Every structure is written in structure tokens, then in C-alpha cells.
Amino acid sequence: FREAFVRIWSERVVNDEFNALVLGAELSWREVVVFRAYAKYNHQVKFGFGTTYTAETLARHVHIVSLLAAYFRTRFGLEIANRQGELARLEREILSALDQVPSLNEDRVLRRFLELMNATLRTNYCQGADQDAKSYLSFKFDPAKITAMPLPRPAYEIFVYSPRME
């Protein structure tokens, strides 16, 4: 929490609704940036839900957000033992939790994060520790794995998120 507060106060991290995940889902400031970046990408490809609604949905389902964060760390972390087995276990747990979400729109928002994580081929997230983290986050996507992606779909897409570019 302290590191997130310092970064928000010093305006190195955006101060918005996504920061509720620091306390609610016990995420680090960098993990919150991952969710914010995916939400901004959703906005760019006209997914249909605004970033405020997305942030509010995430805040209402912090257990699922915690599972999604663990999924992301497992998918892209360095030196993860039994990566495929752990990803399969986490995905089953996420899908089971999603079955309990009463709102169809909230279900779509939450499933979209899992879909985007699975469509992400590469990211710079793991380059450097928290204090050495880059000021931007980049993803390389396989658009064929993203439903409702506007046509024409490129073979690959690079998305860079930075608070300085907003």
C-alpha cells in the first residue's frame, strides 16, 4: 500500500478507480497497472464497456481479480515451476468463480481480462523490480485469440500503456 500511495502522490501512477484494487484485491501498484492497461486496450478496440465501469466491476469482484493477477504472474513470471499445470489450475478456479457472477455484463468484463491475458504473447512487465520498473507497460497480442476484435485483424498487435501517453 505504501509504495502505491507514494507513486500516486508523486504522480508517477494514475490516481483513478483502479487503485481500489491495491486494498481490495491486495495488488501491488504494478499489478494494478496491468489491469488498467488491459482496460485501456479494451477501450481502444471498442470492447463496449468504459474504463470506469470496468474498474468498478473489478472492485466488486476482488477474489476473481486476485486469481487473474496470479494467473498473469504465473503466465509471464520468470522461473515458474510447473507453469502449464499451475495455469490450468488457476484457469479452472477463475472459470468456477466466474460462474457465480450474477451480472452478465460483469461476467463479460471479467472474462475479457482472462481472454486478453491468454492472447498476450509477450510483455515487458517482468523487466526490472518494482523500483526499477519502466514507466510504460507493453503487450504483444495475438488478435486471433481476442473475440469481437474489429476487422481487419492484424497478425500481431503491440499495445503500449503509459500514464504519460494519456
Q: Which residues does each PLM region occupy?
A:
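Extended, well-ordered protein cores
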Residues: 1-166
